[in-house]
Amino acid sequence: EPHIADEAVAALWAPTGGIVCPFGLTYALAENAAKNGVKFQFDTTVTGLTRLDDGWRVETDRGPLEARCVVNAAGVYADKLHNMVQPDDPMTIVPRRGDYFLLDHTAGGHVSHTIFQLPGKYGKGVLVTPTVHGNLLIGPTAIDIEDKEGTATTAAGLDEVRAKAGLAVKDIPLRQTI
């Protein structure tokens, strides 16, 4: 990696590590699930979950459903579903957002591998990585927020990403941000 910062003193080589396109992976998993008989119920609010001998009864705002298996894929609202099933062992998701730079595919060759820094208490830290589509992705920050729907990007957050990414990788072509 010719663009590793001069200040970098150590590295961990993880040859089995890899990158995926999270959107493409999600669609592929959903397509595979559909081909295997999974029925999706979009725009439906779960109001209750009851364990049955052979599966689950799911109460929704569109009527009840029964399923052998329920996957809690509620994202930042997964705590609500968890707490319906395990009210004596509740969990709370603290929402967090992150700022990123996405650079044009012409910048994708700036690094050949995902460059992580030492993780902190808020996560994996800022990384610099090529994407499966040839772009360069830099980030994220990790900001606790109140609003589970909060997706704002801030100048301060982008400044933090720029500074932290520069500790690991030099000469990042940020002018190619898209």
Name the predicted role of every residue range.
Residues 48-50, 64, 69, 74-178:
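Active-site substrate-recognition segment that forms the wall
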